[in-house]
Design a protein with these regions (language model features):
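An acidic, phosphate/nucleotide-engaging active-site surface
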Residues: 11-90, 306
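C-terminal catalytic subdomain
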Residues: 207-298
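Membrane-embedded hairpin module used as a gating/binding unit in multi-pass transport
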Residues: 121-206
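Structural motif
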Residues: 78-80, 197-201, 231, 342-343
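Short connector loops at secondary-structure junctions
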Residues: 2-19, 34-44, 115-119, 154-160, ...
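Short acidic, glycine/serine/threonine-rich loops at helix termini
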Residues: 12-18, 41-45, 88-93, 160-166, ...
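Conserved phosphate- and dinucleotide-binding cores of soluble alpha/beta proteins
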Residues: 58-145, 149, 155, 164, ...
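Extended hydrophobic packing segments that form well-structured cores
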Residues: 289-358
Length: 358
């Protein structure tokens, strides 16, 4: 049986399953529903949350997981995944695959909000963050007797071809630590000064929503200069949330900065936002807080819709004439008229940081 670690994302389609897993029968894939398929197996106490967040968070977190993980009929649970910089936890994978990938709403929502309150730029690219400590606690206390084997990779994709640099297999935290050390070396790209204009291509087969497309914001924000510009070439983006409920919240509240979103979140009248901390955290992560401009170049959603959530909008077909991803090279490019841009063909595979600020 295959249980894709989808979190709140859309289920894996038959086409995606075939592309990723070859000829494994589609009926072997079990879609995880983060609202209905979980059981509560424990709790991370409020006192521990206060300790690891320096007093910024005061509520406990329920530990919920897909009931199949607890099913004794399975004598081996293999959890494969790629370790890369991640906006919510610092470095992706390992126990995140379990507690978010096939976890429940309380853990997904609160872990995202803890990360947003603590500060994304304090965590990205690092181990032992508050969010990672939540998952470490839950794994050690509530899943220690389950037969879970982690299979972690570290990859890059120069020229669009995936190169695997490391494969780490085991049932301890050491496999994560070794993978993180290599991923920090391979997946963090330092620039010597702040980037004035960053152009990021979002592959339409992978990025169909701003929920996913905003990875370009998270991964470049530590490299973009004050007053700079981020332009996302987003031919596949046709909606905001992967989930219809989240899509509605993004359209209602928009990406309008950390302070504004926290004020909206704390307003008792906004119960819909208060009930979805993951969405609130996403709205915080997706804003530059006015430090640089964010523009989506789109073709499958109207410019008015994009502007309605607080981003700038441009026409994809117009922008791609000037910034053709087929002709641009990764890194700095100088255009015929002298404009200098920094081009990233896939934001998912790295983290870009201005060395002056790290």
């Amino acid at each position: 049986d295959i249980l894709p670690a989808r979190g709140t994302h859309e289920p894996v389609s038959q086409e995606q399953a075939a592309a990723m897993f070859g000829d494994i029968p589609y009926e072997k894939f079990i879609p995880h529903n983060w609202r209905t398929d979980v059981v509560k197996i424990g709790e991370v106490p409020a006192s521990y949350l206060e300790e690891i967040t320096e007093g910024l968070w005061h509520d406990p977190v329920s530990v919920e997981i897909n009931r199949l993980i607890m099913d004794e009929k399975y004598d081996l649970i293999i959890s494969p995944g790629q370790v890369v910089p991640h906006e919510v936890i610092g470095m992706a994978n390992h126990s995140k695959n379990l507690f978010v990938g096939v976890g429940g709403s309380d853990m997904i929502n609160k872990s995202h909000m803890v990360g947003a309150v603590y500060g994304m730029e304090r965590m990205m690219g690092k181990d032992h963050t508050p969010v990672r400590k939540i998952f470490d606690y839950a794994l050690a206390k509530y899943l220690k007797d389950r037969p879970i084997l982690f299979v972690l990779t570290v990859t890059t994709a120069p020229g669009g071809k995936i190169h695997t640099h490391g494969l780490f297999i085991g049932d301890t935290r050491l496999v994560l630590e070794k993978a993180i050390a290599l991923a920090q070396e391979k997946n963090i790209d330092f620039v010597e000064t702040g980037i004035k204009k960053c152009v990021v291509y979002l592959d339409p087969s992978e990025f169909k929503s701003t929920w996913l497309g905003n990875k370009a914001v998270y991964r470049t924000r530590m490299a973009i200069a004050d007053g700079g510009e981020l332009l996302m070439l987003a031919p596949g983006v046709s909606k905001f949330g992967e989930d219809a409920q989240v899509d509605k919240l993004i359209r209602k509240y928009g990406y309008r900065g950390r302070i504004h979103t926290l004020e909206e979140f704390e307003n008792p009248e906004n119960q819909d936002l208060r009930d979805n901390m993951g969405a609130a955290a996403h709205l915080i992560h997706g804003s530059s807080d006015g430090r640089f401009t964010i523009t989506y170049a789109v073709k499958n959603i109207t410019k008015e819709e994009i502007e309605g959530v607080g981003f700038n909008a441009a026409d994809y077909d117009e922008m791609v004439k000037r910034y053709d991803p087929e002709k641009l090279s990764y890194g700095y490019n100088t255009l015929p008229d002298g404009e200098e841009i920094y081009f990233i063909p896939n934001p998912a595979l790295g983290l870009w940081i201005n060395r002056e600020k790290f």
